[in-house]
Regions:
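ADP-ribose/NAD+-binding catalytic cleft of ART/PARP-like enzymes
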Residues: 1-32
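Extracellular structured ligand-interaction cores
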Residues: 4, 34-36, 64-68
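Short, flexible loop/turn elements at secondary-structure junctions
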Residues: 7-13, 39-44, 70-75
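Active-site and NAD+-binding cores of ADP-ribose-processing enzymes
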Residues: 9, 65-183
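Charged/polar, solvent-exposed surface patches and flexible loops
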Residues: 16-20, 48-52, 89-96
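Cytochrome P450 catalytic domain signature, combining two hallmark sequence patches
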Residues: 25-26, 54-66
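Extended catalytic/binding region for NAD+/ADP-ribose chemistry, centered on the ART fold
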Residues: 27-53
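A general structural signal for short secondary-structure junctions and capping/turn motifs
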Residues: 28-31, 57-60, 148-149, 158
């Protein structure tokens, strides 16, 4: 059984709704790991996300919120793309469907083609194999304090449904790991 404690950064009013009604799936055609309910492995990443959301003009007057969840599924329903063999398996399963006739053109074109392709590939693979939780550590380059580029990663989880969330609670932004929210 796969069980993991994960974090979701959002706005306070949305956190209240989530705790009452459950999460809504993110369904944009450019989602990083396909459609799903998104979580970060690291609390600090979820806090950064929540604080960025608050700074958006459309969210003026809102407050950040941090949710901690325990997600779960059977081992064979969890797929970790950090494992190179799993990534190769996903690519080889999807690749035959990317060719349009004899012309060899990708089915998806346009400015967000690669993002849409990744989303579509993840959705296809999850559906094909009954995957309920998909994980990947997205790399990015960041300069350290003295200017050296360093590769860091941000692990994310896309969970199919609220049924895969077995515990949920709100934590205080900036609080300690096991601190409850002050609200």
């Amino acid at each position: 059984m796969f069980i993991e404690t994960v974090y979701h950064g959002t706005l306070k009013h949305k956190a209240n709704r989530i705790q009452r009604e459950g999460f809504m799936q993110s369904e944009k055609e450019t989602e990083w790991l396909g459609t799903g309910i998104y979580f970060f492995a690291q609390r600090k990443d979820a806090e950064v996300w929540a604080n960025r959301e608050v700074r958006k003009v459309k969210n003026q007057g809102s407050y950040p919120a941090l949710l901690e969840a325990v997600i779960s599924c059977e081992d064979d329903k969890f797929f970790d793309l950090d494992i190179s063999a799993n990534m190769e398996q996903l690519v080889s399963a999807v690749k035959p469907y990317l060719i349009n006739g004899n012309n060899g053109h990708a089915v998806i074109d346009g400015p967000d083609a690669k993002l849409k392709l990744r989303c579509l590939a993840c959705n296809f693979y999850k559906k094909l194999h009954g995957i309920q939780v998909l994980a990947y550590s997205f790399p990015r380059i960041k300069n350290n304090d003295i200017g050296f580029p360093v590769c860091v990663s941000q692990r994310q989880y896309a969970v199919n449904t609220n049924k895969n969330i077995i515990e949920l609670r709100e934590l205080a932004i900036g609080g300690k790991q096991h601190e409850k929210s002050g609200s």
